[in-house]
Amino acid sequence: MKSMDGLWQMTKFRPYALIVLAVLVVFARAVGFSYIGLDDAGYTFRNPFVATGFSWANVVECFTNFRHGGIWMPFTYITYMIDMDVSRITGMQLSAWMHLVNVLLHVLNAILLLYLARRIASAMGRDGSPWLVLVAALFWAIHPMRVEPVAWIACRKEMLWVLFTLCGLAFWLKYLTASVRNATAKTSLILAFICCVAACLCKPSAMCFPVLAGAFHLLLRSGASEDVRKPGFSAQAIACYIAMFVVAGGTAIAAAYSQTHVAGQEAVALFAAPFHHRVVHALSALGFYFWAAVWPSGLHVDFRMVEGILPQDGAANLIAFAVAAMVAVLAVVYMWRKKSPGAISACLFSFAWFLVPIAPTLGLFGSFGIEAHADRFTYLPAMAIVFLAALCRMPDIAVKRFSDGALFKTVLVVVAVYGGFAFRQAGFWRDDYTAHLRALDCDPGHPRAMVHVGDALCARVKDFDRGIAFYRKSLALRPREYVKYRLAYALASRGGWEDRQEVKRLGAEVVRNPSLDQRGMMLDALGTVYMAEGDWETAIKMFKASIAAPGRFWPKGATKRKLDECIERIR
């Protein structure tokens, strides 16, 4: 039998081809998926500076509008603009094209991750098994926790900022390992900085870029083999660090403002939650991420926190698991330190790679991020396992068995099982109804998921009885004005006498002050009720106010037809 290392050397493209094939097998089905109600529409076809496609006016707006959607990500919005234009030109369904772009971005990131891990191992003078690195990259690429960022159009920002981060760090590594500071090295430095800026413009999470660049620098200085050249801190490198930290600081300010001054909502405090709640959330979220990496069960959209800002799955258990996992890793590193030179520096680097980009999402540095954790937040941090595999030397017996193929095949089967779970998990993201029905299966008391399921039942299958039941249950658990308006619209559509009376009770304040309904849904419901009762003048007033509502996001055709009918009746 040929050794696995021999097969690796047969062609340098074989590992990358295997990565591409695995990702496409698991995620290609996402191209046929529809939209998810959370953010997909608000970022794309209902976004006023995206829906009309690419134009300089729209580009200026996406750079200067810091409040839309609670996040500043101009480069990501520009890609959505291009999506709109491509869909119009080619006639391809918009959702299909957007999902295709997401899948291709994930393919690119998986390729770049494998490339970067091999490059850093080579730069460090490590001779570990390349097949172990490949298996780790496969594990990352097709793990069930990758489903959310790949199958959710709104998560384009995750893959874009990671794409530019990986590219930038590859250029940074090329600069650090250059033997001569010539024009090529300077070009690599400039490209690394450009990628840093681009990543920050895709999502503010990229503010961690200079810290990751510094981690690469320190790793090469402290953990490389003795015969490997150690990069110093040249004036060029220091200037680049300063520039990157300035960009990161500006991005952090923009992120804080966007999260606390969301368009259409009242401004909120940056540190609204008590510090001890933020600490509990951070530790329990880490526990969940560690647990889900091993046992990815119960993953779903919009994971919520229950009253008191504690995780649904129990803070104590998750915190205990997080602490136990970190202690176990430290114990293994301590025992392995003599058999694997550089193990400590490799583990410290991998730990920094995991913790630095995920820290802003944990809620410690501000209350945004305190209400939930999400699989998408681990998209870049989880790559730490690939770098750990590349930088740590395996025991000789494990290397031999990997080379013979026995251990490799066993591990590959395990990775394939995770890929199978990811394929199944992707099926829960077909559309908004399926995604939130899955959320209710995992968390039966999820009030926002009830609203989304109710929307689908009323709009798609006209099952108003079940849809209204979901709205009522959501209101009982968490009263919200927008849910009350949806309930009124569904009641008006069902059209019973008792339904009409309830709509008038629910919308009494809106009748007196129509400006309270920014989206026009309650106004439309009231107009429908007054129309059914023959009060044409009041119905006309309600329909006109509904059509003119500044935050209306749904089609106006049906409302206009009802308005025309009322006007015709008066004549």
PLM regions: where:
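Terminal, low-structured helical/coil segments at or just beyond the last alpha-helical repeat
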Residues: 550-571
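Helix-start (N-cap) detector for alpha-helical repeat units in TPR-like alpha-solenoids
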Residues: 447-448, 481-483, 517-521, 553-554
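Polytopic membrane enzymes that build or remodel cell-surface glycoconjugates and lipids
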Residues: 2-459, 463-490, 495
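Alpha-helical repeat scaffolds
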Residues: 467-470, 499-512
